[in-house]
Amino acid sequence: MPVDLNFTIAAPLLALAAGALLILLLDLLFRYETIQGPMYVAAVGAVLVAGWYLVPLWRGAAEPFGFHGMLVMDRFAAVYGLVLLGAALLAILLSFGRVREDQSGYLALLLWAAMGMVLLGGAGNLMVIFLGIELLSLALYVMIAFAPKRMAAREAAFKYFVLGSVAAAFLIFGFALIYGAAGTMSLTGIAAAARSFTSEGAWSVGLYYKVGVGLAIVGLAFKMALVPFHIWAPDVYQGAPTPVTAFMAIGTKAAAFAAMARLLVAAVPQAYQPSFLLPLSILAFASMMLGATVGIWQSDLKRLMAYSGIANAGYLIMAIPGLGLDGLSAAAYYLAAYGFATMGVFAVVRILEADGVDGSQLANLKGLFYRSPWVGVCLAVLFFGLIGVPPTGGFVGKFLLAIAAVRGGAWIVLTGLILSTGISAYVYLKVIGTAFTRTKVAPQPEEGEEPHPPTRTAAQVVLAIATAGTLVLGVLPGPVSELLRVALAGM
């Protein structure tokens, strides 16, 4: 068999890996005082270089297949890869100002997690999907615990590790059953086998195959925090350092969705997807309703965003039943809008933390508009985006998902979207109202905490980018949506 080494399509992954190794070498060879800035420059540079290499793949200018079909860096992979790299870039900026002893390891792990996420979008083989899941998971397990003084972070990391290991077992067992039924781990081969199961208008697939696909969906649903596999999310979001929570909220959801789309496009013929994937639609409905409803009683902003993420995972599943061009482009658009809004909210938390205040407590948001008017306005815009109020990207994203659901006949998830949006509007408006409530006493810094202006400045930059992105996606939906449709037309 001839060697099929297409390093052109592997370049984005290699750039991230090289950046991580460079950061570790800088820490090994030079004094910390001289390389703090260069480490962040190296991390940002690695992400930008990886994005640069994805652009030709977006344009379709390079052969997307390599390594005997195990890696498929086509336009689909490029679209989701750019979304993931954008999340990684903003997370690096949010991380500026971490304590001395963990900077190099933290940044290297962040790049390796991003590498695993991008790999999932370009997976052409079941084992590559598993490799991507494990690469991002192992990095995140450690990143969550990167808060030496906080026992909550260690507890969150342990919970995520234990439950993540169980989810990985479901995933690999499902892959084993699919392999046994289809006789191949290649997604292309699985697609051919799935079509061969069709006879006389019926899909006569075996039980092992159905169970295998179901178990694989369970493993990926855990990463997306779909009900009932969401139990880890609130505690992990609350306990993890804020930049890690922000990165997880966007990155794991986007990467797991990309892998799920890859798998289901291959494993289930499109004509049979609405009926075969009905249980997934029910899980999506449950996720929307639980995420929106339980958020009402939250007093911690990070836990609130965890339940928001659960609901938004359900929204993404609206693109699954048809898995056509409309669904995939709508999901990519909504992920970008959700990513900007979510990253911006966590930037506000980070700004408060830079002032020595516990930014995750909703009570500390009281009077935010009067202490910092532009931060308060940005927070309002971001939550309007999460609700889906025009002219924000969230409105356009939900509208496109609704269209995809109607065309795919997914009435269950469409009903969930309408009901949960109304409930979550109450939750998010309550947060906005808190920020615009006058108070005579400003929140005081916690004991032992001191203001850190550089961290605040970096978080303000992220907040400005996130707010601008939310508005641009709402004001100029046509060009962006058409660009995504063109890019995903060959999926």
From Swiss-Prot:
Gene Ontology MF terms: NADH dehydrogenase (ubiquinone) activity; NADH:ubiquinone reductase (non-electrogenic) activity; quinone binding
Source species, domain of life: Bacteria
UniProt-annotated location(s): Cell membrane
Alphabetical UniProt keywords: Cell membrane, Membrane, NAD, Quinone, Translocase, Transmembrane, Transmembrane helix, Transport
Major site of localization recorded for this protein: membrane
Membrane-spanning ranges: 9-29, 38-58, 76-96, 104-124, 126-146, 161-181, 211-231, 246-266, 276-296, 304-324, 329-349, 375-395, 410-432, 461-481
GO biological process, one term: ATP synthesis coupled electron transport
A single Gene Ontology CC term: plasma membrane
Membrane-related topology note: Multi-pass membrane protein
Catalyzed reactions per annotation: a quinone + NADH + 5 H(+)(in) = a quinol + NAD(+) + 4 H(+)(out)
InterPro entries, sorted: NADH-Q_OxRdtase_suN/2 (IPR010096), ND/Mrp_TM (IPR001750)
Function field: NDH-1 shuttles electrons from NADH, via FMN and iron-sulfur (Fe-S) centers, to quinones in the respiratory chain. The immediate electron acceptor for the enzyme in this species is believed to be a menaquinone. Couples the redox reaction to proton translocation (for every two electrons transferred, four hydrogen ions are translocated across the cytoplasmic membrane), and thus conserves the redox energy in a proton gradient.
Record text on subunit structure and interactions: NDH-1 is composed of 14 different subunits. Subunits NuoA, H, J, K, L, M, N constitute the membrane sector of the complex.
Family assignment from sequence similarity: Belongs to the complex I subunit 2 family.
Protein name: NADH-quinone oxidoreductase subunit N 1
Gene it is expressed from: nuoN1
